[in-house]
Amino acid sequence: MNIRDLEYLVALAEHRHFRRAADSCHVSQPTLSGQIRKLEDELGVMLLERTSRKVLFTQAGMLLVDQARTVLREVKVLKEMASQQGETMSGPLHIGLIPTVGPYLLPHIIPMLHQTFPKLEMYLHEAQTHQLLAQLDSGKLDCVILALVKESEAFIEVPLFDEPMLLAIYEDHPWANRECVPMADLAGEKLLMLEDGHCLRDQAMGFCFEAGADEDTHFRATSLETLRNMVAAGSGITLLPALAVPPERKRDGVVYLPCIKPEPRRTIGLVYRPGSPLRSRYEQLAEAIRARMDGHFDKVLKQAV
């Protein structure tokens, strides 16, 4: 038995499909299947109920999967401890980002991070919050950049910046010539929202409910770009995070207005596992991002007025 065998087993438990599990481990399906059989022979116990339709684990198999996850987490800690003895900001680093942050933040920070930490090998992964936190907990990811939510409190949270949200309206909307919009003016309005699973949806809904607004349930978007296009088409209005707002106050049929009294904001932070030996690496990364983004949103809000 070796570490790779345990990785195959955990991958199969996660995907419940031999081909997808093999793809995630970057091996052929026969290789993964053969190693699982060897593991069963070595342990003298059946781990799987093999059917033609789906992968079913035996009770012994599920117990071994749970223990394998624990072993793999500890192996990752050992590797982190070893790498900590060398240069802190070098080697591989797997970073997770949520879809409402990654595409808009990365252009601002990636060139700077490559220049500041040239020996750091960054691997970027995009997924929704609950998926990223599960991958962080399992050790697949080293750290995650997301909007801080209750679920992230189980990890170490390092705030990076507070990101304002702006109101996006179509160009011939009655408010199009305003300089800003008090949140109270949204009372009675129905706003377009992202679909379930996006933390931004919950945050935007919270601000809307406090203002007396509601969700337009006729449509739920899968991305911020879809929301933006729906606004441009005159189908409604929405709140967009400032990172996703262009430099111009008006572009492609959409007008962006700052909201006031109160200003809706979300906190973007870097999250990592408690007790990680690479704490100083994450703290240095967070400080570099924080310095790069300092003052950025003041410029965005001024341009929107």
Swiss-Prot record:
Induction: Negatively autoregulated. Transcription is negatively autoregulated by OxyR binding to a short region upstream of its own coding sequence (at protein level). Keywords: Activator, Disulfide bond, DNA-binding, Glutathionylation, Oxidation, Repressor, S-nitrosylation, Stress response, Transcription, Transcription regulation. PROSITE patterns: HTH_LYSR (PS50931). The modification Cysteine sulfenic acid (-SOH) is found at C199. Disulfide bonds join C180-C259, C199-C208. The keyword Repeat does not apply. Activated by oxidation of Cys-199 resulting in the alternative formation of cystine, sulfenic acid, S-nitroso- or glutathione-bound cysteine. Pfam families: HTH_1, LysR_substrate. Residues 1-58 form the HTH lysR-type domain. Residues 18-37 bind DNA. Signal peptide: none annotated. Changing A233V: In oxyR2; constitutively overexpresses oxyR-regulated proteins. Disruption phenotype: Hypersensitivity to peroxides. Increased expression of phage Mu mom gene, hypersensitive to H2O2. 2-fold increase in adhesion due to overproduction of antigen 43 (flu). Gene3D superfamilies: Periplasmic binding protein-like II, Winged helix-like DNA-binding domain superfamily/Winged helix DNA-binding domain. GO terms for biological process: DNA damage response; regulation of DNA-templated transcription; regulation of DNA-templated transcription initiation; response to nitrosative stress; response to oxidative stress. Disulfide bond formation between Cys-199 and Cys-208 significantly rearranges the secondary structure of the protein and activates it. The reduced and oxidized homodimers have different forms which may alter oligomerization and interaction with DNA. Changing C199 to S/A: No activation following redox signaling. One of its GO terms (cellular component) is cytosol. The modification S-glutathionyl cysteine is found at C199. GO terms for molecular function: cis-regulatory region sequence-specific DNA binding; DNA-binding transcription factor activity. Homodimer and homotetramer. Hydrogen peroxide (H2O2) sensor. Activates the expression of a regulon of H2O2-inducible genes such as katG, gor, ahpC, ahpF, oxyS (a regulatory RNA), dps, fur and grxA in response to H2O2. Represses transcription of phage Mu mom gene in a methylation-sensitive manner; MomR binds to the mom promoter when it is unmethylated but not if it is fully methylated. Binds DNA in the upstream regions of its target genes; more than one site may be present per gene. OxyR is inactivated by reduction of its essential disulfide bond by glutaredoxin (Grx1, grxA), itself positively regulated by OxyR. PANTHER family: HYDROGEN PEROXIDE-INDUCIBLE GENES ACTIVATOR (PTHR30346:SF26), TRANSCRIPTIONAL DUAL REGULATOR HCAR-RELATED (PTHR30346). NCBIfam families: PRK11151.1. Oxidized OxyR can be reduced and inactivated by glutaredoxin 1, the product of grxA, whose expression is regulated by OxyR itself. Identified as a multicopy suppressor of the slow growth phenotype of an rsgA (yjeQ) deletion mutant. This is DNA-binding transcriptional dual regulator OxyR.
